């Protein structure tokens, strides 16, 4: 049984009575449908009174040339969700744009904010029919922490209050500049850095990787994001074939790369399985996988070594805590994608710190184009890593961040 006891309330889940442990035969689908462990006879005295959504736009000068986007980004959009109770408490979160939520507010108003499993089921159906509204789940977790007087990492299991970060770059620089950036990450204490491929010819990507390895030696773990799992609407380039991915894997083996991320289209499970069997480099995927059963299939199908769903984009914390545990029961790594904004990074950090054993968590940081000030513009204080690369989470109830109300007012567009 896995849960957190906060006096009279329980946040977590119990396996059904006929499944002795989480590793029993047939545990995977059972775990996906695990029932909530909030005591039904001790309902919260709080009720959801309002849900407010606002949209914000931060101008970017200089532009951010993201490796996964063929268009320079001249602004950064973010959506903020606030869930308030009749007692005046408020949970805040950010992530996806909440498209499709309008008209569904009545499904939550008047309900117990601690009925997280109930709200998760509603959000899952909204996801299927309309759009991804998972920031609401994150806001409900922030609110739950404030109601119960505990930080989210503790509600999720309290495994640790901190998680180590890897520096996640976002731009494509020439080999020398890429090596310079890696040296800066090393000096700042990060244990690992993720480099991006997508220069048109993967051989040019390998040249940049060689320059970095030559500069930092074995002092940094190197991760590679191949950027082949999905495309933006205006990018019609085909994903790599299996033979392309295998050829790249051979180069990454030579350069002692820790993992290769999204080397194939996100739906090519057979290709990922074959690639995983053919290479010593860990295969990572799952950042844009939309449904929990698809993540389950990546795990149980032997397709990945590293699973990377983002709580701000799929499943929320309520859904991904299932996936995090299932991943670990299969002796794989669970370390989320976090490229939304500081609130999204923080939510994923709470999830990992609370219940997952992972070597490091993604920390989007590639100045000057992607600075902490840009990434975390919604927050009064940026989320930082210390001189050894550790993110230490707050003891404050909920997520532990506060919105920058003046900045939100100045950047609001809807």
Where are these regions (language model features)?
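Metal- or metallocofactor-binding catalytic centers and their adjacent structured scaffolds
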Residues: 45, 50-52, 83-148
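Flexible C-terminal active-site loop/helix
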Residues: 33, 38, 43-63, 69, ...
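Shared catalytic-loop signature of beta/alpha-barrel
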Residues: 110-111, 115-118, 256, 265-284, ...
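Conserved, mostly hydrophobic/aromatic
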Residues: 48, 88, 136, 149, ...
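Metal-dependent enolase-superfamily TIM-barrel catalytic cores that perform enediolate-based chemistry
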Residues: 162-279
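Aromatic (phenylalanine/tyrosine) cluster motif
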Residues: 3-4, 10-13
